[in-house]
Amino acid sequence: GEEVAVKLESQKARHPQLLYESKLYKILQGGVGIPHIRWYGQEKDYNVLVMDLLGPSLEDLFNFCSRRFTMKTVLMLADQMISRIEYVHTKNFIHRDIKPDNFLMGIGRHCNKLFLIDFGLAKKY
């Protein structure tokens, strides 16, 4: 009975990217702030990616905080954001979709840890 996040993509999608994204997560596994992938496969008419459940995005938090963060919050978040992006770069990939919606806070014992998600547009360099 553990809660997880499930990302679905129609197998009829014009530009399928979930298989590619699942392979990228496998390359990045073990990095701080990279969600753990539980399973990738096909079910009925869908490609399915199952990963650890995470908390709110930076966009969600920014809205919750009336679109104002303290300097301390900005600096603490920026430090983690830069670290996540640098880690992706050490694996010779660029994310190509950096935005507040793609940075999520962890939950439980990881509630102060920032995670980077959505590698569907990432490219090797």
UniProtKB/Swiss-Prot annotation:
Localization per Swiss-Prot or TrEMBL: Cytoplasm; Cytoplasm, Cytoskeleton, Microtubule organizing center, Centrosome; Chromosome, Centromere, Kinetochore; Nucleus speckle
Entry GO MF terms: ATP binding; protein kinase activity; protein serine kinase activity; protein serine/threonine kinase activity
Ligand binding (ATP): 7
EC number: 2.7.11.1
An example Gene Ontology biological process: Wnt signaling pathway
Swiss-Prot/TrEMBL catalytic activity: L-seryl-[protein] + ATP = O-phospho-L-seryl-[protein] + ADP + H(+); L-threonyl-[protein] + ATP = O-phospho-L-threonyl-[protein] + ADP + H(+)
Post-translational changes noted in the entry: Phosphorylated by MTOR in response to mitogenic stimulation, leading to its activation.
Main location: cytoplasm
A GO-annotated cellular component: cytoplasm
UniProt record similarity statement: Belongs to the protein kinase superfamily. CK1 Ser/Thr protein kinase family. Casein kinase I subfamily.
Record-linked PANTHER family: CASEIN KINASE-RELATED
Protein name: Casein kinase I isoform alpha
The organism's taxonomic lineage, starting at the top: Eukaryota, Metazoa, Chordata, Craniata, Vertebrata
